[in-house]
Design a protein with these regions (language model features):
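A short, GP-enriched loop/loop-strand-helix hinge that lies immediately N-terminal to
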Residues: 1-30, 45-53
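Short glycine-/acidic-enriched loop or helix-start segments at secondary-structure transitions
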Residues: 3-7, 86-87, 123
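A general structural signal for well-ordered alpha-helical segments in protein cores
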Residues: 4-7, 32-35, 97, 135, ...
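Active-site nucleotide/adenylate-binding loops and adjacent lid/helix of ATP-dependent enzymes
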Residues: 28-120
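Peripheral (often C-terminal) accessory segments that flank ATP-dependent C-N-forming ligase machineries
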Residues: 62-67, 164-165, 172
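Phosphate-binding site of ATP-dependent enzymes
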Residues: 92-171
Length: 172
């Protein structure tokens, strides 16, 4: 809570200073479908995806077949408006896709189905210093389970964090 821009809006309306992102950045970043559209409009590549509204989804088995046909398996199914990987499921078999959709729809009216792209999980924080963006060191997030899910994020010892990430300067 407090990450979707509503709290920031209240604080701004009351003239109360706060740290962190403003209203628009918070609202966009907590809605994965809005984030994806924003990044695409800026020319930033993102994983191919399908945005599905709960009320337009129709028969979930038919939808699952369409998702598998378009993206293959494994595929990433995620609730559009949750954080901490809540409502994110990575089905590896066709039989797991419908339950993954049902799980994601518990948390959000909109769900994203995305092509699963294997790779390393990295995070880079950007600070503002003297009005200029300043990147902090790259952090490589290495969950022991292979997926940076809720368990990996909040269970002590389930994930290794490498900072700075052990990549050459060209990569970072």
């Amino acid at each position: 809570y407090g990450e979707d821009g509503r709290l920031q809006s209240i604080l701004e309306a009351a003239g109360i200073p706060y740290t962190g992102c403003g209203v628009l950045a918070s609202a966009v970043s907590m809605d994965k479908s809005a984030t994806k559209r924003y990044l695409q409009s800026a020319g930033i590549p993102t994983a191919p995806c399908m945005i599905i509204n709960k009320h337009d989804a129709g028969d979930l088995q038919t939808l699952a077949e369409k998702i598998i046909s378009e993206f293959g398996l494994p595929v990433v199914i995620k609730a559009a408006t949750q954080g901490s990987s809540i409502g994110v499921v990575i089905p590896k078999t066709a039989q797991e896709v419908v339950p993954a959709l049902e799980e994601a729809f518990k948390y959000s009216e909109n769900v994203l189905a995305e092509k699963c792209i294997k790779g390393k999980e990295l995070t880079i924080s950007i600070m503002e210093e003297n009005g200029e963006p300043k990147p902090l060191p790259v952090i490589w997030i290495a969950p022991h389970s292979g997926a940076y899910d809720f368990h990996s994020k909040y269970t002590k010892g389930a994930t290794d964090y490498h900072c700075p990430a052990p990549f050459d300067e060209k990569t970072t």
